[in-house]
Regions:
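Bacterial N-terminal signal peptides that target proteins for export
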Residues: 4-17
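N-terminal, active-site-proximal structural segment of metallo-dependent hydrolase catalytic domains
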Residues: 16, 31-108, 119-126, 188-189, ...
Length: 318
């Protein structure tokens, strides 16, 4: 009788322990699920766009040309940029060999960017992406051909480790006349259509960045729903769940990204997909004045836009 009581007591105790552990497991699991988005220790990835104006300058009096690759490399390292989209850069065999010269200059100052993608432009103003992270795929899309725009778009897929980043860079047609505006609107609509078709429903959960010189110099470019910027932000419909966001328009108080002797304008943008926009704030975007050269002039009339991608704020590193 006593043995039976002892056996029943042990069984009861075992049962209570099992139930307790089960409850504890259920209570802990949601907590882990809530905290899995926070991954401390992951470094911020700095992604930039910059129109470098051929990586050269000419003395208008003497017509002497100055190559600026070493200065541009120093500016990239100083800003600690990991991935950069370039406009007005020349592919080897064209007007220059900017990509190779830049990579050499970066290597010489211990800031190697060995991964590169590029797209040729009929106007000799080529596009390129340099990266410290592997570029797994790249392609030229929206080639001008019979289209009204003068330059293509460069698309690249970059492996950030546990996440893929899709980066698009472009250099839209300049000037405020109606023909130039129409070309920008047409290319913006074509790029938005390409992105919608390529990503489908996954567009809301994918890291996508549009970074470049979109030459949004006209007030119409900024028009709600129908302007160049809102077309690129996919805001031309009633569905707000797939809206992209121009970080510099949102957080930099309309600071100009281009400045010449005659005027200043917001021509350059970093526009991010819903996944990245949801985690962005005023610290996610910055504008950097290009430093002067030893000759006293600036490296470019365009400023550098930089997006601080903080992986620890995304639910993708698990």
């Amino acid at each position: 009788m006593n043995m039976n009581k002892l056996h029943l007591s042990k069984s009861k105790t075992h049962y209570i322990i099992v139930v307790f552990l089960a409850i504890l497991s259920l209570s802990i699991h949601p907590l882990c699920a809530q905290n899995q988005c926070s991954v401390p220790g992951l470094p911020t990835i700095r992604i930039a766009t910059w129109n470098v104006k051929d990586c050269s300058a000419t003395n208008q009096k003497t017509k002497e040309a100055f190559l600026l690759h070493s200065f541009i490399a120093e500016a990239i390292k100083e800003a600690r940029i990991d991935i950069i989209a370039f406009q007005e850069i020349q592919i080897e065999g064209r007007k220059g060999a900017d990509i190779a010269l830049l990579q050499d200059a970066l290597m010489s100052i211990d800031w190697a960017m060995p991964h590169v993608a590029w797209a040729r432009s009929p106007l000799n103003d080529d596009l390129a992406i340099l990266s410290r992270f592997p570029i797994t795929e790249s392609q030229t899309i929206l080639a001008p051909s019979e289209q009204p725009w003068p330059r293509p778009v460069l698309e690249a897929c970059i492996d950030l480790g546990d996440m893929l980043l899709y980066l698009y860079t472009a250099h839209f047609k300049a000037y405020a006349d109606q023909e130039s505006l129409s070309a920008r609107l047409a290319q913006a609509q074509a790029l938005a259509s390409h992105i919608r078709q390529y990503f489908g429903q996954s567009i809301k959960e994918t890291a996508i960045i549009l970074a470049g010189d979109f030459n949004t110099v006209s007030s119409y470019d900024m028009q709600s729903k129908i302007g160049t910027v809102d077309l690129l932000q996919l805001r031309d419909n009633e569905d707000s769940t797939d809206d992209f966001l121009s970080l510099n328009l949102e957080w930099l108080n309309f600071k100009p990204t281009y400045k010449s002797k005659s005027y200043a304008s917001i021509t350059d943008h970093i526009i991010v997909s819903p996944l990245l926009a949801a985690k962005a704030d005023k610290n996610s975007i910055e504008i950097i004045d290009p430093p002067p050269t030893d000759k006293g002039f600036s490296l470019s009339d365009h400023k550098i836009l930089v997006f601080n991608l903080d992986p620890s704020r995304l639910c993708l590193w698990q």
